[in-house]
Amino acid sequence: MAVQESAAQLSMTLKVQEYPTLKVPYETLNKRFRAAQKNIDRETSHVTMVVAELEKTLSGCPAVDSVVSLLDGVVEKLSVLKRKAVESIQAEDESAKLCKRRIEHLKEHSSDQPAAASVWKRKRMDRMMVEHLLRCGYYNTAVKLARQSGIEDLVNIEMFLTAKEVEESLERRETATCLAWCHDNKSRLRKMKGRQSEHDAKTGRKSRVASGSPKESEDLGMETIKGKPELSCLEFSLRIQEFIELIRQNKRLDAVRHARKHFSQAEGSQLDEVRQVMGMLAFPPDTHISPYKDLLDPARWRMLIQQFRYDNYRLHQLGNSSVFTLTLQAGLSAIKTPQCYKEDGSSRSPDCPVCSRSLNKLAQPLPMAHCANSRLVCKISGDVMNENNPPMMLPNGYVYGYNSLLSIRQDDKVVCPRTKEVFHFSQAEKVYIM
């Protein structure tokens, strides 16, 4: 029974930590399936149209040349349909094989062979490190590690490299690449926006006018006009930034045209923000009047990068922290005790990761370990003190395990490792824990 419970806990832990491993390729497969369906439907409608035109022509007394021309058109449309279908099916097949490969990899964790389980754990650690490096921006290092470990098809490198291109374009103060990304994912971005709107409605939270920060950007309005969806939050922020850049370049007429094209259907909090930025038309680019000075701050580009990163993670249902970070924090919290943070440092153990200098600061904001039953650990040996190794207290008040005192006894005397005081072994008294 205990073995079954342990296996169930391991399986649940695996599902929680490995959710992104399967979710990202599944979303890619879903996206390619929908794109293939649209492409095939569109090309099929084109074929249907030319066939209908051919049938209409044949119902009369057409000339041979016109029939040949129409037949050539039918052949051309059929060729395009075949090519699009083959390309779409190949793309779907690649995504399906990737999902299957990752499922097979995750199944390997339950192997009965210790060597196979050890290899799987090593690969899992490498996958966590690759994802963490990608999130931190160390793309070359991450790619090299994935290639060296043979896990290129087990990590989401392609997704992060696409995000890298978008972020680099925003750093160059260009919006075209990010807008193209928004267009490729417009349906899912609008669904995200709709879910956020429903959540705000249920919680009674009112959307605030975005001032440029990623947190505020996610609170933009979610209304629709006459059944037509608004721009996604990120796309709207990009259009606002384009307007601001036109004002910065003193191209006010172009800014007005831009506003008419992209902001004419704004409503809700988006309309409030449009009204705010339209006020920039009355001020010079070097104005010191708030809030226009803040809108002209180049730091808004960094905020756009953060907003894109946030939306990209939500789009693929990824957390804001890497699995490596979460796993490390969970492990540190599980072994963190008040002894790790004694000011004098006397109670720190050299074998405790939390007591080490590199991880002590990282674990500081984490909660302490939950321990229903206390355990006494000998300072000398690190062994648990129990009925087989009873705790013994020296006259100076320090407690050590009986076996440890035996190991350091010389001429029936023991030296306290902490105070260097010398006592007779018979002076050590047994401690009883109630």
From Swiss-Prot:
Main location: cytoplasm
Protein EC: 2.3.2.27
Record PTM: Autoubiquitinated as component of the CTLH E3 ubiquitin-protein ligase complex (in vitro).
UniProt xrefs under PROSITE patterns: CTLH, LISH, ZF_RING_GID
Occurrences of domain LisH (ranges): 121-153
Subcellular location: Cytoplasm; Nucleus, Nucleoplasm; Nucleus matrix; Cell membrane
All residue ranges annotated as the CTLH domain in the record: 159-254
Chain segments carrying region Extracellular and involved in cell to cell contact: 1-124
SUPFAM superfamilies for this protein: RING/U-box
Catalytic function, reaction form: S-ubiquitinyl-[E2 ubiquitin-conjugating enzyme]-L-cysteine + [acceptor protein]-L-lysine = [E2 ubiquitin-conjugating enzyme]-L-cysteine + N(6)-ubiquitinyl-[acceptor protein]-L-lysine
Domain of life: Eukaryota
Site feature location: Essential for ubiquitin ligase activity: C352
Residue positions, PTM Phosphothreonine: T28
Keyword line: Actin-binding, Cell cycle, Cell division, Cell membrane, Cytoplasm, Cytoskeleton, Erythrocyte maturation, Membrane, Metal-binding, Nucleus, Phosphoprotein, Transferase, Ubl conjugation, Ubl conjugation pathway, Zinc, Zinc-finger
GO CC annotation: cytoplasm; cytoskeleton; GID complex; nuclear matrix; nucleoplasm; nucleus; plasma membrane
Subunit relationships: Identified in the CTLH complex that contains GID4, RANBP9 and/or RANBP10, MKLN1, MAEA, RMND5A (or alternatively its paralog RMND5B), GID8, ARMC8, WDR26 and YPEL5. Within this complex, MAEA, RMND5A (or alternatively its paralog RMND5B), GID8, WDR26, and RANBP9 and/or RANBP10 form the catalytic core, while GID4, MKLN1, ARMC8 and YPEL5 have ancillary roles. Interacts with F-actin.
Domain description: The expected RING-type zinc finger domain is highly divergent and most of the expected Cys residues are not conserved. Still, the protein is required for CTLH complex E3 ubiquitin-protein transferase activity. In addition, the conserved Cys-352 in this highly divergent region is required for ubiquitination by the yeast GID complex, suggesting a direct role in catalyzing ubiquitination.
Function: Core component of the CTLH E3 ubiquitin-protein ligase complex that selectively accepts ubiquitin from UBE2H and mediates ubiquitination and subsequent proteasomal degradation of the transcription factor HBP1. MAEA and RMND5A are both required for catalytic activity of the CTLH E3 ubiquitin-protein ligase complex. MAEA is required for normal cell proliferation. The CTLH E3 ubiquitin-protein ligase complex is not required for the degradation of enzymes involved in gluconeogenesis, such as FBP1.
Record protein name field: E3 ubiquitin-protein transferase MAEA
